[in-house]
Amino acid sequence: MTFAPAVFLLALSGAPALAQSAPAPRDVTLKAADGTTLKGTYYAAATPGPAVLLLHMCNTTRKSWEPLGPQLAAAGIHALSVDYRGFGESGGDRADALAPQDAQRIVTEKWPGDIDAAYDFLISQPGVDRTRVGAAGGSCGVTQAVNLARRHPDVRSLALLAGPIDPDGLAFLTQTPWLPVFAAAAADDQYDDSAPEMMQWILSMSGNPRNKFSGFKDGKHGTEIFGPHPELPRQIVAWYADTLVKNPADPKAAVTVKNTPTRQFWQKASTPDGVGAAVQLFYDTVERNPRAIVIPEAQLNLLGYGHLQAGRITQAIQLFRLNTMLYPKSANTFDSLGDAYLANGQNELALRSSEKAIALLKDDHSGEERKKAIRDSAEQKIAKLKGDKK
C-alpha cells in the first residue's frame, strides 16, 4: 500500500564559544494572510547576525525547540519558533479534531503562507542579516523547512530531524547542491523504523559535501532526542555557526557534488528503463560494502508505485521485491508487492504476498490507522483472489 513519507554518530565539533548574554526570549503574535493568529517565541541575539526559523513536529508545539533557541541566541544567531495554525497557542481549527483529508488540505493550502509570514517577521527583526537565514524542521517540519528554502533563496542552511520529504522538496535539494544540510535521527524512532536511513538518504540525494548526519541508538522521534541527548542542540548550534557565520554557504560557489551510490541508484531507478540497472548496482555495491547504499522503505515504496501507476509493472515488481528484502518485517512492503503481482496477473504470488502482509501485522510497529489500511488492502486482494479460484 502506498503512503506518503516519513552507522551512527558522525560527530560534529562542540558548539562555539558563547557570545554576549542574549535578551530573554519573548512571545510574539503574528498574523497569517487570512487573519489567523500565529504565536511564536523570538530568541534575539545580543549582536547583529544570521537567523534561524524553527518548525516543530506535528505531535508537539513550538515549545519543543526550547532546548535549542536560547543556545542559538547565545551563539549570536537569532531564532524564531512558531506554532502552526491549529497547534499550541495559534488560532485555527484544532489539528487533532480535523478529519485526515481536512488536516492535509490545511497543510497544503495554508501552512506555506503561514510559514512565510513567520519568515518575514524573522528577517524584519533588528540585527537580523536577511541574507544568512537557516531553517530547522522536525518530523512534518522537515518538508516545511526544505520548501521554505525552495521559496526563499536567502535560506542558506538546513537542519532536519527525522522526517520525510515531499517530491517538490526532493527535486529542490537534488537541484540545489550548494545548500548544506544537517540531519539527525534515532534508531528507536517510534514512528519510522528506518528514520536514520531516511535522513541519510536525504543527505545523499542533496549531494553537498558539507552535509552532516548525527545518529543515535535511542532518543525516539525528532526533537524528542534533545531530552536524552543534550549534545544534539549543541551540534545544531555548531552547524549553523559554521554554515551561517564562519563559512556561509554561497549559491554562486562551485560545488563538487558527492555522487554517492545511493544517489546513483535513485537516478537510475527513477527512469523508465533504469530500474534493472539500479537493482544490479545495489547488489554489486552492497557485496563490496553492505552500508554503501541507503534506501528508506517509504521512499522506495513510493518510487515503486510511481512505476506501477505508469504501467511499468515489471519495474515496480523489481523495486517492491527489493523492499521486501531490505525490510522483511514490514507488512506494507509485502502488501505493495501483492498489488504489483495482481496487476501483472501473477495471482498465486499476489495471494502469498497479501497473506504474508496480514501475518506480519501483529508485530508491525506502524500506527493503528496505518495498520488498518494495510489490513484492508491485503484482505481485499485475498478475497478477490480466493473468489476467483472458486
Residue spans of the language-model regions?
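The serine-hydrolase catalytic nucleophile loop
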Residues: 58-70, 84
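C-terminal catalytic histidine-bearing segment of alpha/beta-hydrolase fold enzymes
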Residues: 208-270, 377, 386
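The feature captures the conserved acid-bearing segment of alpha/beta-hydrolase catalytic domains
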Residues: 157-215
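Conserved alpha/beta-hydrolase
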Residues: 72-98
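N-terminal cap/lid segment of alpha/beta-hydrolase-fold proteins
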Residues: 20-45
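Alpha/beta-hydrolase active-site loop
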Residues: 64, 100-126
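Primarily recognizes the serine-hydrolase "nucleophile elbow" in alpha/beta-hydrolase
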Residues: 117-178
